[in-house]
Structures are given as C-alpha cells and as structure tokens.
C-alpha cells in the first residue's frame, strides 16, 4: 500500500507540469551567457558564478581521479530500482551497466574535487533521477504525449516535427525541443527527428541525463543541493512554489549521502 501511494504521488508530480522549466530561458544567442537562474546576458551576473552556458568566466576545477564505478555500486542503484513496482516499465530498462557506459561520454561527472565532492554529486544526481522517474519506474512522462513541448521562440534553431513529441523522457525527464536538439547533437542521435530514442536506448537515455546535468547543473553544484533543484525545475518548485516537492528531493539526497557516507553540505533547499 505504501509503495502504491508513493507511486501515485510521483505520478501526480509528473503530470503537474513541464520539466526543466528554468532551461526555457537558456539557448542564448552567440556571445551571451546563460546565468545560474536561466537568463541571457553579459557581465559577471550572467557569466560569473553559476553560469550555465556561453562564455562563462568562472573556470571549473580540474578533474580528480575518483572512480565513479567504485562509488556507484550495484547495491546502491539496485536499492533504488527495487523500490519501483514490479510492473514499472523502467524497472527492466535502467541498469548500472548502461549508466557506466554513458559515463564514457561524460568522464568529468563525479570527478571534480575530493572523493566527498564526488559522492555528493552522485547523490545529488540520483536524488533527482529518483524523483523524476519514481525510483526509475517511468521512462516517459505520464501523459506527456498529450502536451505541447515545442517552444516557439527557439523553433527557428530547433524546428519541431509535427509528428513527434518532446515531452519528458529518461532519468532527468528531458523536455522541450531546445533540449532535445542539442542533446541529440552532443550524443549522436536525431533529437528533433527521433526524440523517442531517449525512451528506446537506455545508454542514450542516461547520456541525455548526463548531458543536461553537465550543461545546466554542474555549474552550480558547489552552491549546494538547493541550487541543483533550481537548475532543474526552479520555476515550478523554488521560492515557495512547491515546498513539498523540494523537500522530497532533499530527502532523497540526504538518504543517498547517508548511504555513501558523506555529509550533505549546506544550502539544501531553494
């Protein structure tokens, strides 16, 4: 009964609104930076701390030698997936091997800073993956195909196909044409012409989640877990918009930090 209630609550959360809403303000013109809050411009407020895209002025620290596979054990991931109902489509889709394979394209993930920093980044990413997918139950957003995720302002650069849907898919629930386009280009698939690839190829599915993470979340990871919430779905959740959902994400993060044996750090909410 408890698990069913959790799945119902997750389903409601997935239906409530589009994912990655803060990213709607990114996709800036050449020469402009996308700020940590998702707005385009120049200067330190846009290109400094938390800058997500463009000619950012804040340099990233060099990669460390921490090994993700040693931190992300089979027991850790299976402990999450095992909480999904047996009938969930994602239960037999998402695997540790697929995630590790996707990591070959994003070797800096979880490898900046100390081992504790690596553990916190992995805990943060999987807290969001857990929340977005209901413990890896869902591959696609519930009723997502019935929603319009074609952003008119970016349609010239990322043209939508009338026969395709750009609703939430994969661990991060990648959404919108302006995300599918560049995610496809970065990961060698046709994001605009074949967005369903994210639902059909588990390695690509994880790659798109890692792409989004490295593009939009990694730049703010040193500001605390709350900043990662803002980077993923801040417009719908932060600043009092949905404190229950924020707390749910924080609870997952706190639990995964506990499992990995690392302190959560400060600034957990947004």
Curated annotation (Swiss-Prot):
Keywords: Carbohydrate metabolism, Chitin degradation, Chitin-binding, Disulfide bond, Glycosidase, Hydrolase, Plant defense, Polysaccharide degradation, Signal. It is an enzyme of class 3 (hydrolase). GO terms for biological process: cell wall macromolecule catabolic process; chitin catabolic process; defense response; polysaccharide catabolic process. Residues 1-23 form the signal peptide. One of its GO terms (molecular function) is chitin binding. Transmembrane segments: none annotated. Residues 24-58 form the Chitin-binding type-1 domain. InterPro entries: Chitin-bd_1 (IPR001002), Chitin-binding_1_CS (IPR018371), Endochitinase-like_sf (IPR036861), Glyco_hydro_19 (IPR016283), Glyco_hydro_19_cat (IPR000726), Lysozyme-like_dom_sf (IPR023346). PROSITE patterns: CHIT_BIND_I_1, CHIT_BIND_I_2, CHITINASE_19_1, CHITINASE_19_2. It catalyses: Random endo-hydrolysis of N-acetyl-beta-D-glucosaminide (1->4)-beta-linkages in chitin and chitodextrins. The active site is at 132 (proton donor). It comes from the Eukaryota. Its EC number is 3.2.1.14. Disulfide bonds join 26-34, 28-40, 33-47, 51-56, 88-137, 150-160, 238-270. Belongs to the glycosyl hydrolase 19 family. Chitinase class I subfamily. Defense against chitin-containing fungal pathogens. This is Endochitinase PR4. The gene is CHI4.
């Amino acid at each position: 009964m408890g698990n069913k209630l959790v799945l119902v609550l997750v389903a409601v959360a997935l239906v409530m609104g589009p994912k990655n809403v803060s990213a709607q303000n990114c996709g800036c013109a050449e020469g402009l930076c996308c700020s940590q809050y998702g707005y385009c411009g120049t200067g330190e407020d846009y290109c400094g701390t938390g800058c997500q895209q463009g000619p950012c002025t804040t340099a990233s620290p060099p990669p460390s030698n921490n090994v993700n596979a040693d931190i992300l054990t089979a027991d850790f991931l299976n402990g999450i997936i095992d909480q999904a109902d047996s009938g969930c489509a994602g239960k037999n889709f998402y695997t540790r091997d697929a995630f590790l394979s996707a990591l070959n394209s994003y070797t800096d993930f979880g490898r900046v800073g100390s081992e504790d920093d690596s553990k916190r980044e992995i805990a943060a990413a999987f807290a969001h993956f857990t929340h977005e997918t209901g413990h890896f139950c869902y591959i696609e957003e519930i009723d997502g195909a019935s929603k319009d995720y074609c952003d008119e302002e970016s349609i010239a650069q990322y043209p939508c196909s009338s026969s395709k849907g750009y609703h939430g898919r994969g661990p991060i629930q990648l959404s919108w044409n302006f995300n599918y386009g560049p995610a496809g280009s970065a990961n060698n698939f046709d994001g605009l012409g074949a967005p369903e690839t994210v639902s059909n190829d588990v390695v690509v599915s994880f790659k798109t989640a890692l792409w989004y993470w490295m593009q939009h979340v990694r730049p703010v990871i040193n500001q605390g877990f709350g900043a990662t919430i803002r980077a993923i779905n801040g417009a719908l959740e932060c600043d009092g918009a949905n404190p229950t959902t924020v707390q749910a994400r924080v609870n997952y993060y706190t639990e995964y930090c506990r499992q990995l044996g690392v302190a959560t750090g400060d600034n957990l909410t947004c």
